[in-house]
A protein has these predicted regions:
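FMN-binding flavodoxin-like domain, especially the glycine-rich phosphate-binding loop
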Residues: 2, 8-14, 21-22, 26, ...
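Long, contiguous binding/interaction regions
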Residues: 28, 33
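Short amphipathic alpha-helix with an adjacent loop that forms part of the alpha/beta core around
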Residues: 34-40
Length: 146
């Protein structure tokens, strides 16, 4: 299992790091990864914020462009998505949806519930993210690493 994040203000990084700590893993910044990072047989937990008007965070858009350009066959790749946003804006959580659609287009399979944190709701994003990750891991019978 690997944990990736795309962040603008640091909240997605914090959530991903808290999840990674729970499983003895490292959270990895999407802006520092190559498009060939995905491997069949590995589950990816992806935490992604929304920036601007429903866009990916700065730098993550470049990762997405690299994925589009290289068009890898992601058949056999499983991922779970957790989006952060603020429902007072019309493009709530759209950044993660952009990445989700791209991964699906390339053949990857989203598993588990699509997790979301609404900044307007007042709940702690890490608590919501940890609950989501626990549910995904439990549903897919993964043994925690560490």
């Amino acid at each position: 299992m690997r944990i990736f994040y795309g962040t603008e203000s640091g909240n997605s990084e914090m959530v991903a790091s808290d999840i990674a700590d729970e499983y003895g893993l490292e959270a990895e910044d999407l802006t520092e990864l190559d498009a060939d990072v995905f491997e069949a047989g590995t589950l990816y937990l992806i935490v992604c914020a929304t920036h601007g008007e429903g866009e990916l965070p700065e730098g993550v858009d470049e990762f997405a462009d690299a994925l589009r350009d290289s068009s890898p066959d992601l058949t056999g790749v499983r991922y779970a998505m957790f989006g952060l946003g603020d429902s007072t804006y019309p493009d709530y959580s759209k950044g993660s949806e952009v990445l989700d659609a791209l991964l699906a287009e390339l053949g990857a399979e989203r598993v588990g519930e699509y997790g979301r944190h609404d900044a307007a709701g007042g709940s702690d994003c890490s608590e919501v993210g940890l609950s989501w990750a626990e549910m995904v891991v439990e549903q897919h019978a993964l043994v925690p690493v560490g």
